[in-house]
Amino acid sequence: MAVKMLNVPSLPNIPWQEKPADYKLSSPVWRYSENPVMGRNPTPEIARIFNSAVVPWEDGYIAVLRGEQVNGIPYVYLGHSKDGIHWDVEREKVPFVDDNGNPKMPHYAYDPRLVKVDDTYYIIWCTDFYGAAIGMAKTKDFKTFTRIENPFIPFNRNAVLFPRKVNGKFKLLSRPSDSGHTPFGDIFISESPDMEYWGHHRHVMGRGSNWWESVKIGGGAAPIETTEGWLLFYHGVATTCNGFVYSMGGAILDFNEPSKVLYR
C-alpha cells in the first residue's frame, strides 16, 4: 500500500520535474536540472545565500533564507516566489521585535526553519545567546515578527517544530551540543503547552553506524504527517580529509509518541 501524506493542502503550482531518463543513481530524489534557482548574491547586501525554509503563502511561496552579509555575519531574509523557482529576495533583514513592538534583533541568525502551526508561522534559527542557541519568533502576516523566548540554554541547534500539536502539546526536535562543533550529535525531542516553557525531554535517535551519519545528525524540515507516522528528513555528517560531508536521511516517528523511531 502506498504511503500517503495527511493534513497537507493540495498545491497545484508546486514545482516538479520528472526523473531524468539517463539518471543512473538509485536515489529516490534527484536534483533540478536548472539549478541553481537563486544566485549566491541576490542583493548587494548578501554575499552568499543558502539554507532556505519555504512554505506556501497566498498564491505562491515565501521563504526565510540564510544570507551571509558582505561582512561575513549571517542573518535571515525573506524571499518571495510565484512558482518556487524564480525568487525575489528582500534587501532588508527580517525585522524582529519584542512583545511591545520594540526592535529585538539577534546578533546573528542562520540555519532557519519555517513551520505553520494552526494560523501562526514560526521561524526557528540558530542564534547567539552566550553561545549557539535556538532563537524563535512568530508571525501571521510576514510583516510583524515577534520574538519568543529561547526554548533552551546554550548549546543547542537544529530545532524543528512539528506542524501540529501532538497530544495537545507543541513538539520540538533539537540537537544539544557543547561549545565546540557539535560533537554530541544526537536528536532529542521536547514538549511545551505554550511555546514558552519546554520539558519532558526525550532522546529520539543517535548518530548511526553508517559512515555518512557517524559524526552528528540533525533535523531538517518540519516532520510530514503520513499514514505510516511522522516522516522526518534529517542530515547526517561524516568527517573526511576535506572537511565535513553532509548527506540526507529519513526516519519514521510514531504518531502519538514521536520519540519512538519506527523506521530509519
List PLM regions with ranges.
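Beta-rich carbohydrate-recognition and catalytic domains
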Residues: M1-H107, V115-V215, I224-R264
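Active-site/ligand-binding surface loops and adjacent short beta/alpha elements
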Residues: G220-A222
